[in-house]
From Swiss-Prot:
Gene3D superfamilies assigned: ATP synthase, F0 complex, subunit A
Function: Subunit a, of the mitochondrial membrane ATP synthase complex (F(1)F(0) ATP synthase or Complex V) that produces ATP from ADP in the presence of a proton gradient across the membrane which is generated by electron transport complexes of the respiratory chain. ATP synthase complex consist of a soluble F(1) head domain - the catalytic core - and a membrane F(1) domain - the membrane proton channel. These two domains are linked by a central stalk rotating inside the F(1) region and a stationary peripheral stalk.
Name of the protein in its database record: ATP synthase F(0) complex subunit a
Entry keyword annotation includes Transport: yes
Entry GO MF terms: proton channel activity; proton-transporting ATP synthase activity, rotational mechanism
GO biological process, one term: proton motive force-driven ATP synthesis
Pfam families given in the database record: ATP-synt_A
Organism encoding this protein: Ovis aries (Sheep)
Biological classification of the source: Eukaryota, Metazoa, Chordata, Craniata, Vertebrata
Transmembrane feature ranges: 6-26, 68-88, 97-117, 138-158, 164-184, 189-209
Length: 226
């Protein structure tokens, strides 16, 4: 009970399994095509998942934006897999670190913005000044739009960090309460254990949803600049 609540987020704490092997094998999910005439269930599930996600992500993009399809698919698989691996006992979740999430958000956001300035320079600059703005408000609106542009990657990273960290802390707190109540009140301990199971199931869903939200927002930033 004296363990620090943030101990599971310390980088040196790793699950005692060769997770590097799993990480290296994750890109194979992007190439589910088999030489067999009839695919097995795993390959069929991979194809269905990739087609569904790519349809949701890339349907709004033009030809130039669709060149980012493989990168966005890699991104959602990477974030989703790291979030799910972080739910294993005594494992470390990289996406609870703001530095890592900023390291993903800033280059992707920057790439989308640079693409917009290269392909649609006038349209990108026009975003800083909405049409019909009164002359006295022009300097203020330009500053506000500039701040809102540069805060996008920060909001993207903070959203992912906060959601993953909050779920892990809740699981840690309720798990500790369950252990403490086992010797005091068995009925209450059983109730908290059921809540813990439900919260764990919810955290699995949150892990995938946050990967989808992160990638979808990057896709929307790209759509605004292509």
């Amino acid at each position: 009970m004296n363990e620090n609540l943030f101990a599971s987020f310390i980088t040196p704490m790793m699950f005692g399994l060769p997770l590097v092997t799993l990480i290296v094998l994750f890109p194979s999910l992007l190439f589910p095509t088999s030489n067999r005439l009839v695919n097995n269930r795993l390959i069929s599930l991979q194809q269905w998942m990739l087609q569904l996600v790519s349809k949701q992500m890339m349907s709004i993009h033009n030809t130039k934006g669709q060149t980012w399809a493989l990168m966005l698919m890699s991104l959602i698989l990477f974030i989703g897999s790291t979030n799910l691996l972080g739910l294993l006992p005594h494992s470390f979740t990289p996406t609870t670190q703001l530095s890592m999430n900023l390291g993903m958000a800033i280059p992707l956001w920057g790439g989308a913005v640079i693409t917009g300035f290269r392909n649609k320079t006038k349209a990108s600059l026009a975003h800083f000044l909405p049409q019909g703005t009164p002359t006295p408000l022009i300097p203020m609106l330009v500053i506000i739009e500039t701040i809102s542009l540069f805060i996008q990657p920060v909001a993207l990273a903070v959203r992912l960090t906060a959601n993953i960290t909050a779920g892990h802390l809740l699981i840690h707190l309720i798990g500790g309460a369950t252990l403490a109540l086992m010797s005091i009140n068995t009925t209450t301990a059983l109730i908290t254990f059921i809540i813990l199971i439900l919260l764990t199931v919810l955290e699995f869903a949150v892990a995938m949803i946050q990967a989808y939200v992160f990638t979808l927002l990057v896709s929307l930033y790209l759509h605004d600049n292509t």
